[in-house]
Amino acid sequence: PLLRAISSELVFEMRAKKLSGIYVIFCSRDLDDCADGTRFPGIYVRDLDPDGPYSDRNADLSLEFAPATLVQSTGLYTASAWQPAFEYQREASDFLYLPYQTARNAKTLLSADDYGHWTRFPFCLPDDPRSVFSYSQPLILPDGTVYGVVGIGLLSDPYLRGKLPTNELQNEG
């Protein structure tokens, strides 16, 4: 029910900000104790052409991971590598691990914004060749309980390449 309740808001935010993707992953465990392959509930919605025209029925969007019941209730298409949950892989999950675990282990809890994290390098979701840069921050309850992350994805190529002035990014001394 919670994922269904937030799915339309995630789509709205993704469209409004012209993002390639948006996701929420729920977790209440110490990730240092989680083995690779551990699954966490969540949703990842992707738009391969955020600058292009979009369908009122969201036919231009796909779900990278989400429970099957959410796929049925939203009517969104599934990606070819769709999974019913997020599969944790420590070496490829900094977008989850760093903001979540840092907030979880903090002696003095700060605002979720203070734990925000941009990935340093693009990464790929399992069985998907498209690389993504991501920004994520932990989800924190008023009592300090850290229960997951919310984040955005930006396709690194060609979407970001078309947005960034590469001639201005060159370091020539």
Where are these regions (language model features)?
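Short N-terminal helix-loop-first-beta-strand/juxtamembrane motif that initiates sensory/input modules
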Residues: 12-30, 43-93, 105-108, 112-116, ...
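Short, solvent-exposed loop/turn and secondary-structure capping segments
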Residues: 33-38
